[in-house]
From Swiss-Prot:
Organism: Aspergillus niger (strain ATCC MYA-4892 / CBS 513.88 / FGSC A1513)
Protein name: Autophagy-related protein 22-1
Compositional bias ranges of the Polar residues kind: 230-254
Region described as Disordered: 1-29, 229-254
Gene3D superfamilies: MFS general substrate transporter like domains
UniProt keyword annotation of Glycoprotein present: yes
Keyword Phosphoprotein attributed: no
Key words, A-Z: Amino-acid transport, Autophagy, Glycoprotein, Membrane, Transmembrane, Transmembrane helix, Transport, Vacuole
PANTHER family: AUTOPHAGY-RELATED PROTEIN 22
Length: 614
């Protein structure tokens, strides 16, 4: 019989940890300190995506490139558009100019004149430079996430990789303080490194959640009753290879291996699996929602601090570099508690007798597992339709965000503090949207797919409104069609509302189409589709901007990009998808274990906005 550990935390929980399933398996109950470490990293890193990527990083890259560029109109006159040199043009005072950009939107103003730079002899718009940088960082991020998933899931590298990526990303962000405009290419490199490391570290952070849930004292003390199967023995050989076994080595499954097997031996797989995991999913949602809330609170606090710093330092290029340093410092500082308090929680060795311990074997295993999942998806028509729609929709969400910030800066002349405020408004609207869409869905008795369609239609209003600026009658008014800075604020509200709904309902809708027992593998494919799609949209917007010399024509592309998922989503048949998924699950149930995909467990975690609605 397994002896209970004698640590104070375990005694306080009054639970006996199950026996290890493999050498090095850490089955100790989740402690409050471990949870605090997990929350701490959300508090640390969430500021990067909200404050840096959502506000200050794109405009910093554009501004530094602008100061080294020349006017598009004659390709000779330098674009010396520092924020401080223009501040005196407004008599309203430092704080009032946050909301008053009318002085800078006149034709020929250095703030709104389109500027170009030359990289390897190629002419690039300064706004396009920021978009290309983002696309490249997302591409590298997607490759890295797939490649490292094997090492993160199998072996003792999970925590080590998280800390390494956090340190590299935070230091890269802090180094912006030393990047002067003539080194803008170095700034682009730091942006790529920091965004790549952020994405990788957050995926690793998400991989801890199912482990924290699985070994939570509430669940470990409940073996044998409630939603946990009874009569199961914690056999240390339960992960042995053999025909007919499910993936017992998947480190982030909410149920332990013996629970997964019982869940599929009692008849109707779908209903049994749901009943066995309901308690785990409730706890997972609770912990994840707490982490989301903590991360958002930290992001809002730092965003407010950044706006104050930018205003008080007169909104110069140095102001932008300074706030990026503060963002990196925040990220670095609050990573320390996570590094101290999170347990390593090693994963099992690579299965099937594969050679382990080398990075090449981990990478090969990860890519082969992804390939198996992709091949399996070919037989699920509705999942293919949904993933195609999600690919386009996710790309549209990411592209609209970056395009809007750069459009507001380069064509509306909005100052950094005002751009930061737009992001705060959108985030608050997103939290409200995550809750309000569920109310709308219940009120009008909408299915998940219908709610997604409603969100898409509302989202389509954003680029269509920008296209109104091409209509001569509206253009002559001098407002409407994104001709005035104040118009960005209501559009920020719409964007936030849509984000809150789409992120919640798309994931839950996709979950209905997944074969029972293969959630982690298919959610990994969902996450990779999400991450990888953002490579294309920003790059295409950059190409359009280079071609026409301004960002507004890119609204045509954005309108098409957002509209394309609509017919695909309407073609998805949920009932047919469920039948196909269950049939495939039954077909694969008796296959040898080596055919069962395990890839992508590190992404098996609801994302931030998704859990707000649950």
């Amino acid at each position: 019989m397994q002896n209970c550990t004698n640590s104070p935390e375990d005694q306080a929980a009054s639970v006996c940890p199950p026996p290890p399933q493999f050498p090095g398996d850490d089955t100790r109950p989740t402690s409050k300190k471990e949870l605090a470490g997990w929350y701490s990293y959300g508090w640390a890193a969430e500021v990067f995506t909200v404050c840096a990527m959502g506000s200050f990083l794109p405009i910093t890259l554009e501004q530094m490139a602008r100061e080294r560029g020349v006017l598009l109109s004659d390709k000779k006159t330098p674009c010396s558009a520092t924020w401080s040199s223009l501040e005196s043009t407004s008599p309203s005072g430092t704080w009032n100019t946050i909301f008053d950009a009318t002085a800078f939107t006149k034709p020929g103003s250095p703030r709104t004149s389109q500027c170009i730079i030359y990289i390897l002899g190629v002419e690039i718009n300064t706004a396009s430079f920021a978009m290309y940088t983002f696309s490249l960082s997302v591409f590298i991020q997607a490759i890295l996430i797939i490649s490292m998933s094997g090492a993160a899931d199998h072996g003792s590298y999970r925590k080590m990789l998280l800390v390494i990526f956090a340190l590299i990303g935070s230091v890269s962000t802090m180094l912006f303080l030393a990047v002067v405009p003539r080194l803008y290419l170095l700034g682009g490199l730091f942006a790529i490194i920091s965004n790549t490391c952020f994405g990788a570290s957050f995926v690793l952070l998400n991989s801890f959640l199912p482990l924290l849930v699985r070994y939570h004292p509430i669940l470990m003390g409940g073996h044998g009753d409630g939603d946990i199967p009874t009569g199961t023995s914690h056999d240390s050989t339960s992960t042995a290879d053999g025909p007919g076994q499910t993936d017992g080595t998947e480190t982030t499954s909410l149920l332990r291996p013996e629970q997964n097997r019982n869940a599929y031996s009692l008849g109707d797989e779908t209903q049994v699996f749901a009943s066995k995991t309901s308690q785990e999913l409730k706890l997972s949602t609770k912990l994840s929602s707490n982490g989301i809330g903590i991360g958002y609170i930290g992001a809002v606090i730092l965003q407010a601090i950044c706006i104050l710093v930018v205003v008080e330092t007169h909104q110069t290029t140095f102001s932008l570099r300074l706030v990026l340093f503060l963002i990196g410092l925040w990220w670095f500082t609050f990573t320390i508690p996570a590094a101290m308090w999170l347990r390593a929680r090693p994963g099992p060795p690579l299965p099937y007798g594969k050679e382990s311990g080398t990075w090449t074997s981990y990478m090969a295993y990860a890519w082969k597992s992804l390939g198996r999942t992709v091949m399996r998806t070919r037989h699920l028509r509705d999942i293919l339709l949904f993933l195609a729609a999600w690919f386009l929709l996710s790309d549209g969400i990411a592209t609209v965000s970056g395009t809007a910030v750069l459009f507001a800066k380069t064509q509306l002349g909005m100052q950094p503090a005002a751009l930061g405020l737009i992001n705060v408004i959108a985030m608050i609207a997103g939290v409200f949207g995550a809750f309000s869409w569920s109310f709308v869905s219940r009120t009008f008795n909408l299915r998940a797919s219908q709610t997604i369609v409603a969100c898409i239609i509302l989202f389509e209003l954003v680029p269509l409104y920008g296209l109104l600026g091409f209509i001569p009658a509206i253009k002559s008014l001098g407002y409407l069609g994104l001709q005035q800075p104040w118009e960005m604020y209501p559009l920020g509200v719409i964007y936030g509302l849509v984000m809150g709904g789409l992120s919640s309902y798309c994931r839950s809708f996709f979950g209905e189409l997944i074969p029972p027992g293969y959630e982690a593998a298919f959610y990994a494919l969902y996450a990779i589709t999400d991450k990888g799609s953002s490579v294309f949209g920003p790059a295409i917007v950059g190409i359009i901007t280079d071609r026409y010399g301004e960002i507004r024509p890119a609204f045509v592309f954005l309108a098409v990009l957002i509209l394309l998922p609509l017919p695909l989503m309407l073609l998805v048949d949920v009932e047919r998808g469920k039948r196909d998924a269950l049939s495939l699950s039954k077909e694969l149930k008796g296959r040898p274990r080596q055919e069962v995909p395990v890839y992508g467990a590190v992404t098996h975690c609801p994302s931030h906005s998704e859990n707000l609605a649950e």
